[in-house]
């Protein structure tokens, strides 16, 4: 079984309790070394096999997943933040579907919510803002249109909105 685990927004203690338990039980961990806080690996067992995916291709990552599954090992694919937001997990899930390897996702604390917490902010306030849009920086296209154009159209119909733009 492969578990996609969100590493949270950076601090090792911002991982979910479920995510921490999965790291503690994992036989194999594949993590994005350039993005994930290495302190999270301290939750791993001493005999856990740990792989930094920063220099691995998608094919090499999938091969490690296949090998772990064939050996009956529990594998954690540790992604930064919340895997469903800019996590690039779909291509891995598609490959696992093709191979018949079961997987499950464990959410993480997204950096956007970690930022709000550290600043003691609330994105939605009654009578002020009821909409939160999470988008990439300008230059990215959504249905062939620059994201900033989409935001402009949406904001024209909303009195006030909270906006968080990713840096990637």
Describe the function of each predicted region.
Residues 1-2, 103, 112-168:
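Beta-strand/loop-alpha-helix module characteristic of Rossmann-like adenine-cofactor folds
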Residues 1-109, 114:
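Class I S-adenosyl-L-methionine
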């Amino acid at each position: 079984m492969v578990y996609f685990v969100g590493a949270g927004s950076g601090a090792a203690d911002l991982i979910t309790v479920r995510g921490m338990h999965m790291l503690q039980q994992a036989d194999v961990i594949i993590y994005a070394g350039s993005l994930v806080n290495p302190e999270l690996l301290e939750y791993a067992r001493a005999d856990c096999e740990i792989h930094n995916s920063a220099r691995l291709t998608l094919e090499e990552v999938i091969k490690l997943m296949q090998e772990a599954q064939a050996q009956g090992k529990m594998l954690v694919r540790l992604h930064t933040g919340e895997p469903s937001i800019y996590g690039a997990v779909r291509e891995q899930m598609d490959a696992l579907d093709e191979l018949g390897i079961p997987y499950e996702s464990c959410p993480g604390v997204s950096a956007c919510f970690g930022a709000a917490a550290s600043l003691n902010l609330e994105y939605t306030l009654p009578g002020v803002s009821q909409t939160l849009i999470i988008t990439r920086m300008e230059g990215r296209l959504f249905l062939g249109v620059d994201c900033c154009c989409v935001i402009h159209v949406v904001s024209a119909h909303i009195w006030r909105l909270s906006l968080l733009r990713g840096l990637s």
